[in-house]
Design a protein with these regions (language model features):
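Short loop/turn positions at the edges of beta-strands in beta-sheet-rich folds
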Residues: 29, 58-60, 70, 142, ...
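Bacterial N-terminal signal peptides
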Residues: 4-17
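Residues that act as N-cap/strand-start positions at coil-to-secondary-structure junctions
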Residues: 2, 50-52, 60, 70, ...
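Flexible, processing/modification-adjacent segments and terminal tails
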Residues: 21-43, 47-49, 77, 86-146, ...
Length: 202
């Protein structure tokens, strides 16, 4: 995700270590909500982003269901222990076991895991107008994720945007909008592959 947020100057004097307080509130606020999202991926060295959009349903993190509608239909489902990635056009489902390393590479999973945040990242916050900017800097130089910036509405504690850069220099952003409460069940966060599709396990 691309971000031009410049927080480093302020962080030297104003940023304070955050013991997960704001992110814990944000994680709690997400539970049982549905929102529209726009994802932008900008490869290193490129100025034009690849844009995708759809809807996302959050259970208690790390349970999530990301339904992409444009430009291609695909589905990501997370139950906390596994993820399912289904592309109807390819007739293939990829099932991945989420170990600690994989979890640390997925910012939305870190938001809901206080212990993993403390272990893997230095967390700081800055109040910026009507929003709180939370930054996660990896403790390990070899970390896949280099920098995460989370924009949280100060009044509702809802996440508005997540930006991050990976160690290859690629930028990714998720913008959330139109969040509203909805009924959720555990069945939403489990995926049964349709008959006739190829299943790849990782």
């Amino acid at each position: 995700m691309q971000t031009k947020l410049s927080i480093f100057a302020l962080s030297l004097s104003l940023a304070i270590p955050l013991h997960a307080a704001e992110l814990d509130r944000a994680a709690a606020a997400l539970a049982g909500t549905e929102a529209q999202f726009t994802q932008r991926f900008t490869p290193k060295g490129f100025k034009t982003a690849q844009v995708e959009s759809g809807t996302v349903i959050f259970g208690t993190l790390p349970m999530m269901r990301w339904s992409y509608g444009r430009p291609e239909e695909k589905l990501f489902v997370f139950d906390g222990q596994h993820s399912w990635f289904y592309v109807p056009g390819d007739k293939q489902v990829t099932v991945t076991a989420l170990d600690a390393t994989r979890r640390s590479e997925l910012p939305f999973l870190m938001i809901g895991d206080a212990a993993a945040r403390e272990k893997n990242f230095v967390v700081r916050e800055n109040a910026r107008g009507p929003a709180t900017m939370v930054t996660l800097q990896p403790r390990a130089a070899s970390a896949m994720i280099r920098n995460v910036v989370i924009t949280i509405a100060s009044d509702s504690h809802l996440i508005q945007r997540v930006d991050y850069t990976d160690r290859e220099g690629n930028q990714t952003s998720f913008e959330l909008r139109g969040a509203h409460q909805r009924a959720v069940s555990n069945d939403l966060f489990h995926f049964t592959p349709p008959a006739g599709v190829q299943v790849v396990e990782q």
